[in-house]
Amino acid sequence: MDGLNILTDPVWSERVSPVSFVGPRRHRPPGIRFSDLPRIDTVLVSHNHYDHMDVATLRRLAAAHHPPLFAGLGNTAFLEKHGVPGSRDLDWWESVPLAPGVTLTAVPARHFSSRTPFDRDRTLWCGWVVTGPSGSVYFAGDTGWGSHFQMIRERFPNLRLALLPIGAYRPRWFMSQAHINPEEAIRAQETLGAETAVAIHFGTFDQADDGELEPVEELKAALAHHPDPKHRFLALDNGESLDLPLLPGERLPSEALAKEGQG
């Protein structure tokens, strides 16, 4: 985005668990091999659950790319203790510059945090909005339904892209406080006013009763019942990419640099 390569909740490990030999195991490989990554400029971590804060991956990224890492309040001490340097904590609605003209803001989410049975909610969970010349992108992390979607729209009224979770939502009596389901993800896009939404948090690790395939099937069924020509909600295949059209007057970063060189 705007010349920056940003990773959100990166996981290249085989399992998401306190130990490497048991726990949820991935159904499919990462969408890109670690060795094929471009230069990584920034890493965003939404919260400290094992499927979002993968310390082994964060260490590899720190060694290979040395990117700044941003997380919610209280996470820096843990990351530094476990060999992940260069992190910074942000509170909800706190903003920092990532590059000239590009700003990162931590935004609310309805979730919780824990790494053990004894540290629940001792660190902050959040979503992220990155704003730059090409527009604003929202990454929800994990979240249940709540008024924060409307609050985010009020502060960022022209979202171009929303990355919204659709998996780990059943059984609803247990999961609804922390995970939206596919139909709620569609409502979230509508509430946010995002032009495009891309589904995340599905199909890789089994963590709830909805399993590997149901979230996408439910999303497609819900979209078929409520077609909206003004918005599009996509569930990309593993490894598939999406290019957003340029805004009027917007140039690719390489074109902008070339023009500056001619100036």
Describe these PLM feature segments.
Residues M1-D36, A71-G141, R160-G167, E218-E240, L244-L246, ...:
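Metallo-beta-lactamase
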Residues P10-W12, N48, G74, A109-H111, ...:
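Active-site metal-binding loops of divalent metal-dependent hydrolases
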Residues S254, K259:
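Short Gly/Ser/Thr- and charged-rich N-terminal loops/segments
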Residues M1-L4, L98-R160, S176-E184:
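Catalytic core of the metallo-beta-lactamase
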Residues R26-R28, P68-F70, G74-A77, S136, ...:
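Cap/insert and terminal regions of metallo-dependent hydrolase folds
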Residues V43-D51, A199-G203:
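Histidine-centered catalytic micro-motifs
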Residues L4-N48, A56-R60, G74, S114-R120, ...:
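Pre-active-site segment of Zn-dependent metallo-hydrolases
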